[in-house]
Amino acid sequence: MKKTIVAVMVAASAVLSAQAMATNTAQVTVLGEVSDAANSCVVTPTGTLNNGIVQLITVTTTEANAEAAGKLFKTQDFGFDVKDCAQGSTSPVTAVTVNVSGTSSSDATILDNTAANGAAGIGIGIQRVSDAHRVAFDGSDTMSESYSATNGTQLKYTTGYVRTNAADLLPVD
């Protein structure tokens, strides 16, 4: 039986944010929710997640301009350990479904920079470590992940900056 985990990378609300790029920092905020006691799981953040936030390393416009458009760079790994799903249920869990959403415009795999006066031409992307699948943020990318009642499952991702086009980034006032 499949159980849906409603969380980013285990979450489905518009909770991913590409804000703060105007202040030389960027955060990917990840909020999670698992509901219904009969279908619940224990979800533990791993990697560089700290209170649901992945802090990306500062990138300069020179560094960003040297990268190819659409490519992840200055990445950070994060993930979730999922275990103890539907403990005691008569219907064992064999898979979890991961839904992701966020603000994207021209490319569903790139989160828009929504910071006030933020840098133009740069966003944030996330990809699954196991197969380098780029996550889409428009709700179209439902990913099924295997689950073992004995071992649980590890959801592993990497996130980083992405140039959104070939034009050079310009410094923000």
For each feature predicted by the language model, list its residue ranges.
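Gram-negative bacterial Sec-dependent N-terminal signal peptides
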Residues: M1-A22
